[in-house]
């Protein structure tokens, strides 16, 4: 099973990716993780990527694609993989398809977790974290017993900069510009499947499992 996972920030992709990886015994390949691994191991591509990152520049497609290609040739990908965070553009998707076709491992499904913007804003802006022990809360879905105080250590709860409304809206705007053309690309290829991401974790995973079971 070879899967691309798509969805906006706050859609729960990380949670679902872990569950999919465990159930179908395929590696969850996050581009962030493989970038960090290549930089840490000082591979030629990692060194090149670090040079761009250190200069505050976007890593060019050829470097990103090279790192992903290298990861997909590992033995643990023989029976499939779940790609999370790549591709981000149609150009990257085309390069990935060309590579996978060349090794006879074409994609089975592009899985899109759909969540309305208002739901994501509520989900992400409501998150709070303890400044001391790192415990996580949500002002609506998992509130602390005392407002603004951690249940565990009684220290202050804060909203991270990444969870402010302005930052979340900015990330959603970037996602829309980048990903809508990508969604249309996979629709044209006939491999996209959509899941409602507003349901519970178990319900979303149940729907994903049904889709992946059909596509096996």
From Swiss-Prot:
It catalyses: AMP + ATP = 2 ADP. Residues 126-163 are annotated as: LID. ATP binds at residues 10-15, 127, 136-137, 199. Its EC number is 2.7.4.3. The keyword Zinc applies. Pathway: Purine metabolism; AMP biosynthesis via salvage pathway; AMP from ADP: step 1/1. One of its GO terms (molecular function) is ATP binding. AMP binds at residues 31, 36, 57-59, 85-88, 92, 160, 171. Zn(2+) binds at residues 130, 133, 150, 153. It holds the Pfam family ADK. Keywords: ATP-binding, Cytoplasm, Kinase, Metal-binding, Nucleotide biosynthesis, Nucleotide-binding, Transferase, Zinc. GO terms for biological process: AMP salvage. It comes from the Bacteria. Residues 30-59 are annotated as: NMP. It is an enzyme of class 2 (transferase). GO terms for cellular component: cytoplasm. InterPro entries: Adenyl_kin_sub, Adenylat/UMP-CMP_kin, Adenylat_kinase_CS, Adenylate_kinase_lid-dom, P-loop_NTPase. Consists of three domains, a large central CORE domain and two small peripheral domains, NMPbind and LID, which undergo movements during catalysis. The LID domain closes over the site of phosphoryl transfer upon ATP binding. Assembling and dissambling the active center during each catalytic cycle provides an effective means to prevent ATP hydrolysis. Some bacteria have evolved a zinc-coordinating structure that stabilizes the LID domain. Monomer. PANTHER family: NUCLEOTIDE KINASE. Catalyzes the reversible transfer of the terminal phosphate group between ATP and AMP. Plays an important role in cellular energy homeostasis and in adenine nucleotide metabolism. Belongs to the adenylate kinase family. This is Adenylate kinase. The gene is adk.
